[in-house]
Amino acid sequence: RVNSIVLKRCRKPANEDILVPGDTVCVIGTTSTRVPYEECDDMRVTPDEVKLLLAEGEKLAPCLNDTRILRAYAGVRPLVAAEGDTSGRNISRGIVLFDHEKRDGIKGFITITGGKLMTYRLMAEMATDLVCEKLHIDKKCETRETPLPGSGKGDVQEVAKNIWTKPSTAQKATAGRIGSFASKLKFDTEEEKSLVCECEEVPESEVVNAIEHLDVHNLVDLRRRTRVGMGTCQGELCACRAAGLLGKAHGCTQRAKQDLVQFMNERWKGMFPVAWGETMREAEFTSWIYSECLGIGDEAEDGTTPETPVFE
C-alpha cells in the first residue's frame, strides 16, 4: 500500500489521474477506451495501458517505480453517452433513471444506470421510489437511514476490541471487512483460529461464517466477502484451503476443484499484464505448485503460450 489518503489530479477527467488506497493495497487508474459490444464479457488489460498508468502514476507517487504491482484489471462501465462524444471522457458519471413508460411507451419497465459503487445506495433509493410510485405503494426507500449490516456499532477500532483471540493486526483486518459481525466468529479450536489466507489474515472461522451466512457459493463470492486470494500471492497458497472448505460445506469436492481452476485462471488473467520481477516469480511458483505438485491441469500438446495459464 503506497498511500493512506486519496491522491487525485485536479483536472478534467483523463487517464491515470487518481491513486486510491483500499484495505491492504492501493489502486491506480483509470484508462478509458471504447470497446465493441461483443467484447464486453472478456475485457483484457494491454501492456501499453499498464505502462501508461505507471509512468503517469509516478508523478503522483514516485515510489511507484519500486513498488510491487500485484495485478491489473479492466471492466465495463454502464455510462450513458451524449450525442457526438467519441472519446468517452465527456460521458457523465452521473446517475440516469429511465421511466420507459414515459420515454418509450413501455409499461412496467424502468432502467437505472450510470453512477458507480460509491453511489449504489442512492441508485437503489431512486429506483425503489419510482417502482413504489408506479405500483401505488405509499412508502419511501429506507436505505439512507438504515446502516449496512455490521456497520451499526461504532468504528473498526471499537469492534476489533471484541475479537480477543486474534493478533491486533488481524483483529482490525477482520473488523474492517465484516464490522460488528466479527464479534460473532468462533475461535474455540485451532482450526477456527488458523489462517486460510495469510496475505490478508483471513481465519478459517471467517471463511466458514461467510459460507454459512453471507450467500457464498464459490471462490469468487468468497473473495468478495473476505479478500481471500487478493493478497500478494494471488491465491497461490489460500485458494486450495478455501476450496477445501467450500467442498466440505457443499458436499461436492469435484465442483470445488473446478471452481479452484476457474478462480486461479482469473487470478492469472490479472497477473499476466504485470508479470515481471516479483510478480513473475510468484506466477511461476504458482504454476509449479498447481501443475507439477497438485496435477491440476496439463499443458496443451502443442505447448502453452504466455497468455494461457498452464493450470487451465
What are these model-predicted stretches?
Residues 62, 235, 239-265:
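Long, charge-rich, low-complexity alpha-helical segments
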Residues 251-312:
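Low-complexity, small/polar and acidic-rich linker and loop segments
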